[in-house]
């Protein structure tokens, strides 16, 4: 996730998608944008660039923004291309301070909350039903007040993998 504060009367963020936007519609990168810890956007990235309006008003304000990939990296990533701000602040965009604790989680699709938003346990895989913000990894980091990163690849666990249908214990 990328976190920063933005000060101004109007702010937007331009997001960029990678080659994952060319995946089938059920497997394009899924992302979320939060403003002051409230979910603003939860969407699948299907274009090379998307602009999200963070806020707009007459009074200047400071807001905390978080942009987070909710699906596995193997299905594509997103990045912040630009932050556009109308502001009188000398430094309108600043990174959020790092927390004392940083945890990196490495695992398979369960680490990215595979199927957590599916309607049934027999639903086929779709990035639309993965949501890292509901994963054990993210929730653990939140409880420990830690920053976190995750490396999550379907079928490629640390102990074993199931990418071909056969258990791999190499």
Range-by-range predicted roles:
Residues 73, 116, 121-170:
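Conserved SGNH/GDSL esterase-like catalytic core that processes O-acyl groups on lipids
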Residues 1-106, 110-129:
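N-terminal secretory targeting modules
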